[in-house]
Amino acid sequence: MIDTNIVLYQAEWCPYCARVRSKLTDMLLDYKVVNVAQDHGQRTNLKEIFGVTGIPSMIDGEVKIADDDDAIIAYLEKAYGG
């Protein structure tokens, strides 16, 4: 696994989130998962960070991408070469 600062805000039932998780796994990137569906406080935290509550959303250091699986995957490919 490649050590990263990636935090993925997601829900297990979300197909768009599954797509991002699959990409992260395929690229062997280590990441932290925050399941917003299980913790209402995390949904509030998501709104404070991104201004929206849509998932998947991701933070990687200074980079924040909200509610867009295609943009997250494009970023991962560019930043981590995959």
Summary of predicted features, one role per range:
Residues 1-29:
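Local sequence-structure signature of Cys/Sec-based thiol-disulfide redox active-site neighborhoods
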Residues 54-65:
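A short, hydrophobic beta-strand/beta-hairpin element that forms part of a small beta-sheet core
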Residues 78-82:
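Generic C-terminal helix-cap and adjacent flexible tail
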Residues 15-18, 41, 67:
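Residues that form or flank phosphate/diphosphate-binding pockets in enzymes
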Residues 63-67, 72-76:
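C-terminal cap of thioredoxin/glutaredoxin-like
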Residues 39-41, 45, 57-58:
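BRCT (BRCA1 C-terminal) domain core and associated BRCT-interaction motifs
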Residues 47-54:
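Thiol/disulfide oxidoreductase modules built on the thioredoxin-like
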Residues 10, 30-42:
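Thiol-based oxidoreductase modules, predominantly thioredoxin-like and allied folds used
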